[in-house]
């Protein structure tokens, strides 16, 4: 059956295994994943609704938050529905071109998320270090340009991937030992010289993570200096308190990345399922917890949600 699905260059379909070695537990593993995905959908949709409905939240900080919520929705929805179909219905087939599209969206929106977190760090820097110029610096025009730049950077860096993968002959078969079409998992099936794909993928990841994190850290160095120069402890606490949600979002996004990178080096001989579970955790954790972080720590959002519940109880 499989040979008939193979053309002279690539398979008509790939087969996504799921989590290798844990196939018998897929139904149970799907429960926390489904719960996390549901939370991500509800949380991020709620954030978008509140920001759109409340005119007082049409400020730079919340517009960036709306971008982050949109990206988290796309990121989780790019992989989770297909993953749950594998776990529940053993629907392992994915069209070759659908696989490339999934890969493009997955990696592009991951890059966009990093860019938006950097933009949010810039927002906090201007708000705390240059408060008198906040509204004149972060204009609607600049926010639009930042959003467009985030999209343009991601699309520019990820557009080569599908074309690089189309040129290979996949003589190692169509079975991908993963839950979704991750770039390196697909490259492993290709014959020929894949060194450029390997180098390009690693170089882009390092460029994005190192560059964006460097500027985020630099922003917080200036923020910390400005906060420590404030006269009263109450003012310092209030100023830094406005950054807590953003710091939480940064930690929720980059901590799984760091853990995954460390595990790939110190536990490179670990079973593939360990790395796959970490990769899924990296995809699901930020979209699930970011709305919770901002809902708990942001007064305006928290009060709006509480007001909705109070109306229902009246």
UniProtKB/Swiss-Prot annotation:
GO terms for molecular function: G protein-coupled receptor activity; olfactory receptor activity. Residues 1-27, 78-101, 163-198, 261-275 are extracellular. It is a multi-pass membrane protein. Residues 49-56, 123-141, 220-239, 297-314 are cytoplasmic. SUPFAM superfamilies: Family A G protein-coupled receptor-like. Pfam families: 7tm_4. Disulfide bonds join 99-191. Keywords: Cell membrane, Disulfide bond, G-protein coupled receptor, Glycoprotein, Membrane, Olfaction, Receptor, Sensory transduction, Transducer, Transmembrane, Transmembrane helix. GO terms for cellular component: plasma membrane. CDD domains: 7tmA_OR52K-like (cd15948). The chain crosses the membrane at residues 28-48, 57-77, 102-122, 142-162, 199-219, 240-260, 276-296. It is found in: Cell membrane. Glycans are attached at residue 5. The keyword Isomerase does not apply. PANTHER family: OLFACTORY RECEPTOR 52K1, OLFACTORY RECEPTOR 56B1-RELATED. Odorant receptor. Belongs to the G-protein coupled receptor 1 family. This is Olfactory receptor 52K1. It comes from Homo sapiens (Human). The lineage of its organism: Eukaryota, Metazoa, Chordata, Craniata, Vertebrata.
């Amino acid at each position: 059956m499989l040979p008939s699905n193979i053309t002279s260059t690539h398979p008509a379909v790939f087969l996504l295994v799921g989590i290798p070695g844990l196939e018998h537990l897929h139904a149970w593993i799907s429960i926390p994943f489904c719960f996390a995905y549901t939370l991500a959908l509800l949380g991020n949709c709620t954030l978008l609704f509140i920001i759109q409905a409340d005119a007082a939240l049409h400020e730079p900080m919340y517009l960036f938050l709306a971008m982050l919520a949109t990206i988290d929705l796309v990121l989780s929805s790019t992989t989770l529905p297909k993953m749950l179909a594998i776990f529940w219905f053993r629907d392992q087939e994915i069209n070759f071109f659908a696989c490339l599209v999934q890969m493009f969206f997955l990696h592009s929106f991951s890059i966009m998320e990093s860019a938006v977190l950097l933009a949010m760090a810039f927002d906090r820097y201007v708000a705390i270090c240059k408060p008198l110029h906040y509204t004149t610096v972060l204009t609607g025009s600049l926010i639009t340009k930042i959003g467009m730049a985030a999209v343009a950077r991601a699309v520019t860096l990820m557009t080569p991937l599908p074309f690089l993968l189309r040129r290979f002959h996949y003589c190692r078969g169509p079975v991908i030992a993963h839950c979704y079409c991750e770039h390196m998992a697909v490259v492993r099936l290709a014959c020929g010289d894949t060194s450029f794909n390997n180098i390009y993928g690693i170089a882009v990841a390092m460029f994005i993570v190192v560059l964006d994190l460097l500027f985020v850290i630099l922003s917080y160095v200036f923020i910390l200096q400005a906060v420590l120069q404030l006269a009263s402890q109450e003012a310092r606490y209030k100023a830094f308190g406005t950054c807590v949600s953003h710091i939480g979002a940064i930690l929720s996004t980059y901590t799984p990345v760091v853990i995954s990178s460390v595990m790939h080096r110190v536990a490179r001989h670990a079973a593939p399922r360990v790395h796959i579970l970490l990769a899924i955790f990296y995809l699901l954790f930020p979209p699930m917890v970011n709305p919770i972080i901002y809902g708990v720590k942001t007064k305006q959002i928290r009060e709006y949600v509480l007001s909705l519940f109070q109306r229902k109880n009246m």
